[in-house]
Amino acid sequence: MSVPFSSNGITVDLFDPTVGIPFDGVVGEGELDYQANTNSLVAHWAPTLEPELDYYEYSFSTTIGGDDIIPWTATTDTIATVDSLNLIHAQIYFANLRAFDLAGNPSFVSSSNGVTVDLYGPITGIIIDGLSEDEIYTGAIDSLVASWTDFADTVSGIQYFEYGVGTTSGNLDIREWTEIGPVLTINAGGLTLIDVTTYYISVKATDLVGNFSEIVTTNGITADHSGPVGTIATDSDSTDIDLQNDLVSFSGHWESFSDEYSGLAYHETALYNVTNASYEENWTNVGIDTTITFYGLDLIAGSTYELHVRGVDAVGNTGAIINSDGVLIDLTAPIAPLDLVGWFTTGRILLEWTANTEVDLGYYSIYGGTENNPTDLLFTSMENTVEAF
């Protein structure tokens, strides 16, 4: 009888191995949801710690668990990279993984959540100077505002916008591209805007994989730092006056102001007391009217008052003040003329008197008749020598 020999045994393995979930992308960069690469796909996974593990198989597909892009391929690594592909825009690609143990038992198939190929930049929208409507002029001296709508990226989505500023359309001679996040407005501060210079804001969008859109540019906004210009202001509502004895009202009018750029928005008026250098009536918006009457006043006799007018344009610039030549409040009648002398002949009467010295004298009234202290007005004169008949 021979000596018996024994094999080293065989273990019956009826249990399938386990396998983790594959992740799209390379190790250390997190889960990849989108990519711009059309040539390759990468996946990685945590190692299976079971001692019976023999190898892994991976595939890439356009459906979960499939292998239409890369068929099942054996590996002992925990990363799979495939090249020389021709991936399609907006298509989702899945990494699929299974493990085999030493007995040849396969694990279940585990699939990634997929990576979408994004080859194109965002779609551009509309941009305007301003927030709610397109502005043509700005009164700002150090900032510009723009807003935009209808930008879109239907695959990976918009990650951020960039803006720049120039003095010609599309140029960036004032401010180079500046990232501002996924916002729809920009208040570009820290600028030095020059009067009557037109500025253009350009914007572009970048999606989550780095594709950028075409550039869109505003139609331009012009800095307007000068207020409206006036010409003449006149005391009274018609012909200019220099004196009045009304203490409770004051009237004036003026030629409409003009503004070459943003345009006149409204006039403002005030009543100024020249004598005590203060405003009797403060500045009031009177719209585009060119006449004003102040009521309910308490004017002071002997004081001179001027009408002050200024214009405000559409972007808020206030122009220089123009003023009337002033009205003296006069409540004192001139004294009666002195030293009246009359020379009588058969053909005429010559009257002469000492001229009054009041600076506000208007004229003399000459009365005549056949009785003492006649009341019939014959005429008026500025001179102190007249012929009555």
Question: Residue locations for each model-derived region?
Answer:
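Short, solvent-exposed loop/turn segments at the edges of extracellular beta-sandwich modules
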Residues: M1, F100-N105, T206-N211, V312-N317
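Recognizes extended acidic, P/S/T-rich segments that occur
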Residues: D33, S59-I88, E162-I194, A270-I300, ...
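Extracellular acidic loop/turn motifs
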Residues: P47-D54, G65-G66, D150-I158, G170-N171, ...
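Extracellular Ig-like/FN3 beta-sandwich strand-entry sites
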Residues: A90-I92, V196-T198, G302-T304, L361
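Pro/Thr/Ser/Gly-rich low-complexity, intrinsically disordered linker/stalk tracts
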Residues: P4-T48, S111-A152, I215-F257, N323-D360
